[in-house]
């Protein structure tokens, strides 16, 4: 591998943009890379380079999660531009599960919209610990009082979903006007343009408000596979974020879930096209697997230290069923209901076998808004463990969120 080495000098943070469709998430991502490219080691990325999938071009809506890297004075960031459209919440669930914090982008002309709320709820469910808000399109509002009202509404919405709405930083600005200024003069520095300053101010707030996470480097290694590539002459590469532990080139690992357990050796590690000898929890990496064909491994499997996690199909869980207002079902459901269960990077159909209320009494039907214990049997075995969170989806919408209480089989 003649690639350049990845230098681990600054703390590494995984971050992303979330929010309603067309509120300016991808534009903001581009503005951040352009503004930071002036100050140091960041490569400027244009909107078109981030907004990369062909289906998306047709609709102007971000689908696949795009990974971008940038640096501030204090940190190295990997940024996921998260899909905004309801059909692609699936990617948000798998992309967001990788975030140490997120920038919630809200258009000042609309305020919080239904998808904004769905994304805040999902951020809570998949465990995004910290949010910072960018109130975009500020230039289109000429009334300061209106901006203040929108800010109040945002804080109230965040509080409703158990985020600290009163202390979360809200930065107003215009990502588009910042990009226009940077296109005219790519060398703009702080103090020369108010719109660019607002982007730099946002990054200062992210640096200070989103804490550097303590990585689980001393636990047993586990990576949930997001994607699989075949590289001619080199073999099969699985990509994903290391959830816990660390891994070195040459170590033996197991591939678990969806198919029979397979053992393999790691022959290479890469991050942002640079090679690594060792990768640690929090890193988004490509892992080269010895002797594994592309058809033997797929998204949703995990790569783990041998003997540390098993595939299972049946578990008991505590679940919250979303109300109609939260974007959930309008009607109750019964035993035998078969929705999709989203766990880590995988979605598997599961059959709900039985329900119990919190006091242990058996329940015949479940209403939107109920908190319930339920036993689930999946159609395929996946690597799961006690304490793991999951989302329940059906027909393009999130209908519930849960946590595994114990494994049955």
Curated annotation (Swiss-Prot):
Keywords noted in UniProt: Elongation factor, GTP-binding, Hydrolase, Magnesium, Metal-binding, Nucleotide-binding, Plastid, Protein biosynthesis
Stretches the record annotates as G3: 81-84
G1, as annotated region: 19-26
Gene Ontology biological process terms, A to Z: mitochondrial translational elongation
InterPro entries recorded: EF-Tu_GTP-bd (IPR041709), EF-Tu_GTPase (IPR050055), EFTu-like_2 (IPR004161), EFTU_2 (IPR033720), G_TR_CS (IPR031157), P-loop_NTPase (IPR027417), Small_GTP-bd (IPR005225), T_Tr_GTP-bd_dom (IPR000795)
Binding site for Mg(2+): 26
Chief location: plastid
Taxonomy, superkingdom: Eukaryota
Region (G2): 60-64
Gene3D superfamilies assigned: P-loop containing nucleotide triphosphate hydrolases, Translation factors
Residues bound to GTP: 19-26, 81-85, 136-139
Record's subcellular location: Plastid
NCBIfam families xrefs: EF-Tu, PRK00049.1, PRK12735.1, PRK12736.1, small_GTP
HAMAP family per UniProt: EF_Tu_B
Protein name per its UniProtKB record: Elongation factor Tu, plastid
Organism this protein belongs to: Euglena longa
